[in-house]
């Protein structure tokens, strides 16, 4: 992939933050994106995607569109691809000028914000088809489905088999992941062996959405969360309660005990492949380069750690939606139903090297069939994935959590830092009337 999932994580919050500011100025439907109809009665529907420069995924999407256009004459879908770095701002600008396309892709965590801001329309009449997709690939808000994606990725641990074997460390499985105590003992043994510069690398040098995507699942495994998901009105008790404080102390101890660097190097994956690190916290996107490396036979892919409430990993990647102001919503929905056939889920996920969103599609993609070499990543996603908080306020929550987690790693008092984060998050939710 030209644009890796890790790179994509860096830009998630910007568009939602822009949507938040635009919606505050006047929430409502982004109408005005009329479908043009030619002399033969064929309506042209515009489709926007973030995949300019991401040749393999764009080619797969273009094939879906070509097949759809060739299957009927009532609608014609036209693709416009944007560079990822400018895509989100292009969407929010189009929403402000009421010129959104009928069909567009959207990053999963942004869906609640864009739906609340009036950008997106519910995918009415598609519930049965959507029910076959991994829950983390469906963008739902206020009880309605607004988006659905072809794929997801999974957070994993990559470990050197030799480091585990030489130190008598059990290889964990989905059914029996490492416990908190086992993980601590494993790190202590690896460090004591003196063979590794880093027993663990959590990629703390990464920026942006990586922090809430990668580290809030550990908070959730302890029993805390970023906000109370019952009503999304307050983070009190979730982000500053005993479980959250325990998470904060544990997270910082990984650095103070010398198990992982306070700030990882410029390329943690390469550090792992070069023998500097014994265990790398990474995503399923790291499997392909690991298997192509000189140490492929000494690498094992593991589930995340159970810190008390079961392993948790972040869920939700790019998804497809219909805009609220589309003048031919029946055409946009017709395309969506066609495009989400299992064969297209398979072709797009294969092109991107990601986890297919349906069981039938997974059976078509080499490696993701039951028992295939990548099937474990799909099982991790099925069993452990938790989508980020389904509230339009998520962008603020994400940046607040990032700052708080960084402050804690750098020595801030955990309780005080978490209490301040709760105050800030609650104030933001309340200032927006809890996005009601």
Set out the residue ranges of the language-model regions.
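Short, solvent-exposed loop/beta-turn-alpha elements that line the ligand-binding surface or hinge
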Residues: 121-135, 173-178, 198-209, 222-246, ...
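Glycine-centered hinge/linker elements that transmit conformational signals in sensory
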Residues: 184-191, 229-262
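Extracytoplasmic/periplasmic solute-binding protein
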Residues: 146-150, 155, 181-233, 277
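Extracytoplasmic/periplasmic substrate-binding proteins
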Residues: 50, 111, 214-217, 245-328
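Conserved N-terminal structural module of periplasmic/extracytoplasmic solute-binding proteins
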Residues: 2-113, 128, 307-309, 330-331, ...
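Conserved C-terminal helix/tail region of periplasmic/extracytoplasmic solute-binding proteins
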Residues: 165, 383-436
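Long, aromatic- and glycine/proline-rich binding clefts that accommodate carbohydrate-like moieties
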Residues: 139, 302, 350-400, 432-436
């Amino acid at each position: 992939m030209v644009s890796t999932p890790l790179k994509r994580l860096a830009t998630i919050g910007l568009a939602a933050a822009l949507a938040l500011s635009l919606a505050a100025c006047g929430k409502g439907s982004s109408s005005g994106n009329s479908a043009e109809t030619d002399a033969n009665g064929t309506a042209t529907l515009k489709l926007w995607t973030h995949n300019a420069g991401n040749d393999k995924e764009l080619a797969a999407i273009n094939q879906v569109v070509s097949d759809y256009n060739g299957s009927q004459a009532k609608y014609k879908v036209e693709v416009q691809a944007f560079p990822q770095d400018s895509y989100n701002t292009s969407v929010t600008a189009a929403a402000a000028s009421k010129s959104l396309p009928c069909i567009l892709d959207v990053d999963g965590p942004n869906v609640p914000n864009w739906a609340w801001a009036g950008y997106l329309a519910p995918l009415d009449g598609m519930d049965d088809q959507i029910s076959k997709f991994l829950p983390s690939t469906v963008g739902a808000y206020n009880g309605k489905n607004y988006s659905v994606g072809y794929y997801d990725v999974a957070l994993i641990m990559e470990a050197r088999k030799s480091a585990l074997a030489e130190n008598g460390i059990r290889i964990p499985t989905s059914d029996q992941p490492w416990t908190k105590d086992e993980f601590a003992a494993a790190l202590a043994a690896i460090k004591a062996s003196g063979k590794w510069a880093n027993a663990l690398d959590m990629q703390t040098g990464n920026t942006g959405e990586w922090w809430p995507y990668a580290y809030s699942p550990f908070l959730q495994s302890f029993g805390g969360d970023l906000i109370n998901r019952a009503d999304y009105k307050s983070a009190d008790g979730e982000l500053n309660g005993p479980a959250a404080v325990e998470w904060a102390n544990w997270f910082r101890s990984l650095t103070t005990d010398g198990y992982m660097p306070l700030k990882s190097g410029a390329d943690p994956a390469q550090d792992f492949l070069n023998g500097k690190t014994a265990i790398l916290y990474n995503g399923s996107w790291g499997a392909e380069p690991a298997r192509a490396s000189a140490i492929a036979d000494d690498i094992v892919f593991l589930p995340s750690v159970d810190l008390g409430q079961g392993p948790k990993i972040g869920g939700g990647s790019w998804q497809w939606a219909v805009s609220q102001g589309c003048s031919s919503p029946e055409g946009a929905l017709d395309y969506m139903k066609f495009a989400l056939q299992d064969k297209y889920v398979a072709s797009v996920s294969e092109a991107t090297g990601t986890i297919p969103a349906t069981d039938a599609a997974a059976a078509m993609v080499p490696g993701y069939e039951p028992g295939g070499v990548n099937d474990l990543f799909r099982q991790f996603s099925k069993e452990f994935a938790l989508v980020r908080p389904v509230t339009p306020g998520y962008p603020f929550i994400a940046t607040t959590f990032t700052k708080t987690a960084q402050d804690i790693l750098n020595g801030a008092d955990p309780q005080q830092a978490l209490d301040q984060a709760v105050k800030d998050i609650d104030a933001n939710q309340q200032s927006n009337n809890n996005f009601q």
